[in-house]
Design a protein with these regions (language model features):
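Outer-membrane beta-barrel channel domains
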Residues: 2-167
Length: 167
């Protein structure tokens, strides 16, 4: 099937991206790794639809490679099936950094399609603070209706006890 990947600048600082029948054939393959632990491996995202403006979806300053609670990890989307389509809006609107997208994947026999959505907004509070929120809906495999909402506050000072950095 033919696929489509299109990007449009809605404003100079806000972009919309559409993908249909995505096969991500241009994505670099991961090296094979044997995981003998009971914990999931967090490999970096390589698909362009998800890597473009990926920093806008970061939560609480957490790195995806760290085995901690990460509310959104795009590598799970489309693992067991293809992605039928996706729409993403990302950029800044005034002082607010924002990112939102919805992706549709083939579902099960009782639910022919499954959708997953993520929305994230953050605003800087001066030079050293940032306040944000995230909301997700759905599961990457379409097997449930799970919602998550969270808020985060980041504080960073480069003048903590002299010249040390405090986060």
């Amino acid at each position: 099937e033919p696929s489509l990947y299109a990007s449009l600048s809605v404003t100079p600082r806000l972009n919309a991206t559409l993908t249909l029948n995505s096969d991500f054939a241009d994505a670099v393959l991961d090296a094979r790794v044997v995981n003998l632990s009971r914990f999931e491996l967090f490999k970096p995202e390589r698909r362009s639809f998800f890597t473009q403006d990926a920093g806008r979806f970061g939560f609480g300053g957490l790195e995806v490679e760290e085995p901690v609670l990460v509310p959104f990890f795009s590598r799970r989307i489309g693992l067991g099936s293809s992605i039928d389509g996706g729409l993403k809006l990302s950029g800044t609107a005034g002082p607010i950094d924002l990112g939102a997208f919805v992706v549709q994947v083939p579902g099960r026999s009782d639910a022919p399609v499954a959708r997953m959505g993520v929305a994230r907004a953050a605003i800087g509070l001066g030079e050293s603070q940032r306040l944000g929120m995230i909301a997700t809906q759905g599961t990457p495999d379409g097997l449930g209706r799970i919602q998550l909402a969270g808020m985060d506050h980041q504080f960073r000072s480069t003048r903590f006890m002299g010249e040390r950095t405090f986060e």
